[in-house]
Amino acid sequence: MIQPLSKLVVADNTGAKEIMCIRVLGGSKHRYGTVGDLIVASVKKAEPNAAVKKGDVVYAVIVRTKKEYRRKDGSYIKFDDNAAVLVTPQGQPRGTRIFGPVARELREKHYMRIISLAPEVW
């Protein structure tokens, strides 16, 4: 469950290390974001000489959440951290590598490029 002001780890090689959610996209009543949701975020920590800089406003897709997520088969999945991957406004990843596992729900949301770059899909 990601809401405005939530901090997330960045799980790609764009150079950003930590982002803060500004808005969960998808309607005026869409208060909380879960796996596969698109958010607008601000870069809070970044590496020097990176593609993104501290203070940049970026789009990101949530790939892992600490809060458990109920799947249609009745099982639950949760991760050790809240993580996101930076994307373009069209939904294509900005980085060329993704670190750590991502949830299978990204396939249902049609983020196939993120799925193909990820080392593990849970």
UniProtKB/Swiss-Prot annotation:
Chain segments annotated as coiled-coil in the UniProt record: none
GO molecular function: large ribosomal subunit rRNA binding; structural constituent of ribosome
Gene3D superfamilies, alphabetized: Ribosomal protein L14
Gene Ontology biological-process annotations: translation
GO cellular component terms listed in the entry, alphabetical order: cytosolic large ribosomal subunit
Keywords: Ribonucleoprotein, Ribosomal protein, RNA-binding, rRNA-binding
Transmembrane annotation, as ranges: none
Superkingdom, taxonomy of origin: Bacteria
Record InterPro entries: Ribosomal_uL14, Ribosomal_uL14_bac-type, Ribosomal_uL14_CS, Ribosomal_uL14_sf
Role summary: Binds to 23S rRNA. Forms part of two intersubunit bridges in the 70S ribosome.
Stated family: Belongs to the universal ribosomal protein uL14 family.
The protein, known as: Large ribosomal subunit protein uL14
Source species of the chain: Thermomicrobium roseum (strain ATCC 27502 / DSM 5159 / P-2)
Name of the coding gene: rplN
